[in-house]
């Protein structure tokens, strides 16, 4: 277990330095391909709602079993060959399961387009990291969408997998990512996924329940450390962290809104339909492109604080 903890630290460092290199096939794509293949054959529109839910549950079972079982077998084999082999493989897995640098890189692409006043380019850049319709967004809308996705993915893409890996190594990290990837692909409330995606959505809500709240609190702490408005961040966290259809998504969005002294969320277009949504935060000042830079500063601060706390707690547990 100490080697798994070391692998997490090394994997985090690799993520900060390398991120997701272009041209390198990401293992999460294999999980996505598996989900797409199973959904294509198992999600039949002609099926009854009950059968669609059963098939969604079966798909989730298959995806979770394969996505975590295969890495576990590979790790057991590698550690059996030699502890160093196991450490190297688990470090690579931990690196691939974290998304700190890639989240910053993708959001900064939007920032650079906004600074050039390239609205069409910024819409395209933000469409790569959000699920909403981006062609209707103005510059403020693009900026808000980017800040929101940095906030939400601070939990989903960094803190949650980090927490699960601190608890159970890369094996548990893969289990979490398989659930989270299913949620991002099939947990939509439309005709195609309303019933089929319900179980994956529930599983994601459960898997993120504790990590999202912990991420929110850690983000409040980090907001003080990176010299943002930590006091207001905590106030908005307490007030607005349930202003979302998801029980988890607004936890870190509320902290981000408070730390930046801006208002996030609100109505958004998805698949050509306007969805009425509550706002998060106070409209103290207008959202601006520089908020993307500030959001990334808070992302990195939260990631470092979380790693230090998680590894320290796990190390003390292993010692005693």
Describe each model-derived feature in a short phrase.
Residues 1-175, 179, 187-320:
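Hydrophobic alpha-helical transmembrane segments
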Residues 184:
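Glycine-rich phosphate/dinucleotide-binding loop and adjoining beta-alpha-beta core of small-molecule
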């Amino acid at each position: 277990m100490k080697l798994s903890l070391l692998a997490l630290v090394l994997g985090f460092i690799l993520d900060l330095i390398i991120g997701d290199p272009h041209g390198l096939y990401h293992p999460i794509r294999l999980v996505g391909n598996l989900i797409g293949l199973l959904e294509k054959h198992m999600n039949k529109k002609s099926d009854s709602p009950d059968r669609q839910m059963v098939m969604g549950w079966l798909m989730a079972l298959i995806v979770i079993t394969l996505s975590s079982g295969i890495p576990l077998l590979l790790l057991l084999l590698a550690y059996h060959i030699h502890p160093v082999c196991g450490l190297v493989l688990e470090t690579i897995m931990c690196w691939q399961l974290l998304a700190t640098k890639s989240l910053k890189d993708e959001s900064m692409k939007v920032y650079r387009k906004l600074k050039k006043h390239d609205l069409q380019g910024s819409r395209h850049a933000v469409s790569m990291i959000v699920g909403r319709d981006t062609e209707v967004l103005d510059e403020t809308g693009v900026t808000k969408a980017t800040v929101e996705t940095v906030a939400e993915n601070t939990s989903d893409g960094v803190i949650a997998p980090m927490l699960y890996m601190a608890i159970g190594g890369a094996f548990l990290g893969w289990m979490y990512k398989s659930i989270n990837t299913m949620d991002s692909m099939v947990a939509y409330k439309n005709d195609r996924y309303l019933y089929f995606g319900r179980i994956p959505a529930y599983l994601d809500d459960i898997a993120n329940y504790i990590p999202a709240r912990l991420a929110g609190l850690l983000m409040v702490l980090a907001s003080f450390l990176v010299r943002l408005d930590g006091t207001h961040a905590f106030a908005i966290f307490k007030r607005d962290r349930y202003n979302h259809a998801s029980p988890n998504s607004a936890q870190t969005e509320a902290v981000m809104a408070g730390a930046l002294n801006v208002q996030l969320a609100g109505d958004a277009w998805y698949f050509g339909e306007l969805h009425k949504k509550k706002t998060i935060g106070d409209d103290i000042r207008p959202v601006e492109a520089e908020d993307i830079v500030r959001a990334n500063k808070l992302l990195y601060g939260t990631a470092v604080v979380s790693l230090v706390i998680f590894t320290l707690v796990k190390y003390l547990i292993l010692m005693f």
